[in-house]
Amino acid sequence: MQEEKSKEDHSRLINVTAKDLTVRNRRLVEVPYTATLSHAMNTLVANSISALPVAAPPGHWIGAGGSMIMESDKQTGVVRKHYIGILTMLDILAHIAGEDSNLSDLDRKMSSQVSSIIGHCLEGLSLWTLNPNTSVLECMEVFSKGIHRALVPVESSIESNNTIAGVELIESASAYKMLTQMDLLRFLKDHHFDDLKTVLSRSISDLGAVNDSVYAITERTTVSNAINVMKGALLNAVPIVHAPDIAQEDHLQLVNGRHRKVIGTFSATDLKGCRLPELQTWLPLTALEFTEKTSGKEREVVSCGVESTMEEAIEKVVTRGVHRVWVMDQQGLLQGVVSLTDIIRSLRSTLS
C-alpha cells in the first residue's frame, strides 16, 4: 500500500515542470558587465536578491564554465546579450574586505566594474539553464548537487527537436526567469506537502540531511575577517559561537563549531541593506556587533533539533527566508547544519 502511495506521489510531482515553478517569478533582474559594484549592490538591495546575472555583448567573452547562454530578439533571432556569469553579494563584500583592506579606499573599490570580479568566488562561475519542460524531480536532482540557481527560458530559440529536458550550458531565448533552490522548496510547501507526508514526517537525522561538519566564527571575529574566511571556504553564512577558550589568532579564522553555543548568524546577505558610509564604519566591528546593529536587537537564531522533522526544517527555511538551519542538541549546543542543498538532496533520494 505504501509503495503504491509512493508511486502516486512520484507521478504527481513529475508532471510539475520548471516552467510551473517560475510562473509567478518576475522577469530576470540583471546588470551589464560595465556596471559598477556600487550600481550592482543597489540593484541587489532594491530587488531583495543576493545574486545577479551579468550581461555582455555577444562574441567578446567566454561564459562562466564555458556556457553560451544568450538573449536573442524574439522576432529576428539576432543575439543581443551573452550572460557571462553570476555576481553575488559575497563577491562584492570579498572585494571590499580583501587583503588591501584600506577602508578609506571604499569609493574606489565600489567604482570597479563587475566584470573585474566575476569568478573571485566560485559561485560566480556557476551559470546554468534549465529547459522549461524539465520535471521538478530533475530540477531537484540539479539543485541537490549544490547548484543554487538556474535560468529558465521563457521562450527558447533552440530548436525544439534538439532540446532535452534538463540542465544546459547552451541556450538562446528572448527572455529568462531565475529559478532558485528556495523557489523549489516554497512551491513544494505551498502545493505538494500533502503528497510528501510520509517523507516530511521523518526526522532530518533519519533522512541523512544533517551535515555535522559545521564551521563557525567567534564572538570576536570582525566583519572584515569573517568575509575573507567565508570567501575562502565558499560559505555564504556562518554561525557565531561562544569560544572564550581559544587562542587570539583563532578569532581570525574559521573554527569547528560543533558542541559550542550559537549566539548569532553572520550572512553575506546581512550587508545588502548597508549604505556605503555605513559599510565603512561597520567592517571593523565584530560580526556579532554588526548583526545586532543591523537588526536593532539581538536576532533569534534559526535552529532546529536533531530529531526535528523534515517538514519543520522546510517550514523554517521558507518562512524565515534563510538558506540553512543550525541543528542543536537538547543543551542548545551546535551539532550540525541543514542547508537547502541537504534538504533537496534528501527529498530527491526518497523519490527515486
UniProtKB/Swiss-Prot annotation:
Keywords noted in UniProt: CBS domain, Repeat
Pfam families, sorted: CBS
Phenotype reported upon loss of the gene: Shorter siliques and reduced seed sets in pv42a and pv42b RNAi double mutant.
Presence of keyword Zinc: no
PROSITE patterns to which the protein is assigned, alphabetical: CBS
One GO term (biological process): embryo sac development
Top-level taxon: Eukaryota
UniProt domain CBS: residue ranges: 24-106, 122-196, 210-281, 297-352
Keyword Protein transport assigned: no
Tissues in which the protein is found: Expressed highly in rosette leaves, cauline leaves, open flowers, developing siliques and dry seeds, but at a low level in stems and floral buds.
Summary of the function given for this chain in its UniProt record: Plays redundant role with PV42b in regulating male gametogenesis and pollen tube guidance.
Entry similarity comment: Belongs to the 5'-AMP-activated protein kinase gamma subunit family.
PANTHER family: AMP-ACTIVATED PROTEIN KINASE, GAMMA REGULATORY SUBUNIT, SNF1-RELATED PROTEIN KINASE REGULATORY SUBUNIT GAMMA-LIKE PV42A
Protein name: SNF1-related protein kinase regulatory subunit gamma-like PV42a
Species of provenance: Arabidopsis thaliana
